[in-house]
Amino acid sequence: MSRTEVTSRPGPAGSPVLWSDLLGRRIRQDGMDTLGVSTQTLAEQHLAKGEWEIAGDLAEYFLDEMTRINNALFTWLEVILAFPGSGVSVDGVAEPRQVIAAMRSFGPGDGDLVAVALACDAQDLDAASARIETMRVRMAAVHDQLVWWIQHLLADIAERHSEEAVRDVVIRTYEELWRDRYAAWPQMTPVERLQISVEGMRGHLSGPRHRGDVGIIEEDDRFRMVLDPCGSCGVLRRGDPDSGRPGCDPAGTRTAHDWSWNRVGVGWYAVHSAIVMEWLPQQEGRPPMRPLDGCDTSGPCNWFIHKDPSAAPAGAP
């Protein structure tokens, strides 16, 4: 089943995955007490209640969350491989896209999702839970390898060319990927901005079990998302809390830049957050979109979504 079909068709009554006119698809819209809970965990809870249709819908949406993020990473790789300074580029952009297209279409979790649906039809709780877990593990392996690959390619560009060349690759990727993803951001309510932000980090499989758990704290003027660890650069640096795979000390900035939080040692994968969420909006005369604090460190990463975007301070969360 295509991921587009999953989020464009109506879901069963009681499912928290609801239609969004702004996004043109369904997205989880449950309350603050559960929005940061892994979609896998939510599906398991409905399985335990015998709510098979809702659990099956959540399993489909869980695969959609992970696929959406992996597809974003594939798009980023297309841009990197087509970049003239990458050292692996080929003439034109079509060839990198052809290379990535084969990988993008593989669908490592598709068979497991079919098995989950069959188990739900048979009301087999153990089988459904087991196949959701297997689906996550398969998707996580692809996700983590893509993050690792991007980190190493960007590190090579920085070493062979310049740190500014990495910034330029991220800007090109913004035009191909993130600009469209966040096109509706100005029209969204604060809660809608939170929903799409949390969805992305559930899809990155953040949290202490690498299954998509995100802390959410509502403050007077903003929402705080707590990623401990972030499922991408956090797992890269700190290791996989699920499998026990050790982290690494990722190569990163040797010079403090205004597009890297004026920090030295920000990993090359992680630096896109500073560029896309803070530096680029300010270059265009807008406030930071989603300021971060503690990104790519040994501790939690905090994201801030201000209820009044114009109140987001420049250069600080």
Walk through the language-model features, giving the residues of each.
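N-terminal accessory segment detector
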Residues: 2-271, 276-283, 287-300, 308-317
